């Protein structure tokens, strides 16, 4: 039994959406159960573990996908339950993601998949294309907008706006098919 933070963050978001659409209480209960597992076993301060396997946290720090998917899921859960603690946890993880994964390279804003100094990687990849699942950058951008609009976090909103303008116009313009979640 392996728990991947990011995939479970997506599951939480999906379960909350199912509950909102159907008022099916077990969906919200399951979302809370999964979120509590992540909070209790995979979060340490502002660090989110990527993998929990057989009772042990396997990798101390997650990727942008993990932070974005879980951070956004916790914001969703806060709005669904009215429990401010979920919002605070989501905001804390998204704040950590700003520090770990956001960089500026030659005037271009980059959202990296891995944190700087990750000793497991030879190359530090960017997170900017959606595939079978949305990219961490897309979900991170949407969560930054939510923090800006709902909580009045002007820095989060400015970062999201800058990233969107940069990715959707000019020399770094991206393919719309590869960025459907970013455009949503």
Residue ranges of each PLM-predicted region?
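Glycan-recognition and catalytic cores of secretory/periplasmic carbohydrate-active enzymes
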Residues: 1-184
């Amino acid at each position: 039994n392996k728990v991947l933070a990011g995939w479970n963050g997506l599951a939480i978001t999906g379960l909350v959406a199912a509950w909102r659409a159907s008022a099916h209480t077990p969906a919200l209960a399951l979302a809370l159960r999964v979120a509590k597992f992540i909070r209790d076993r995979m979060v340490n301060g502002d660090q989110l573990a990527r993998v929990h396997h057989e009772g042990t946290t396997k990798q101390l720090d997650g990727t942008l996908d993990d932070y974005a998917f879980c951070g956004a899921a916790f914001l969703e859960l806060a709005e669904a339950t009215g429990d401010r603690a979920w919002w605070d946890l989501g905001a804390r993880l998204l704040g950590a993601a700003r520090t770990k994964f956001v960089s500026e390279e030659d005037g271009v804003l980059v959202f990296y998949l891995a944190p700087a100094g990750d000793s497991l990687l030879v190359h530090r990849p960017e997170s900017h294309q959606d595939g079978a699942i949305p990219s961490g950058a897309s979900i991170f951008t949407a969560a930054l907008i939510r923090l800006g609009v709902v909580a009045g976090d002007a820095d989060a909103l400015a970062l999201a706006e800058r990233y969107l303008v940069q990715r959707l116009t000019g020399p770094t313009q991206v393919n719309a098919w590869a960025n459907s979640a970013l455009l949503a």
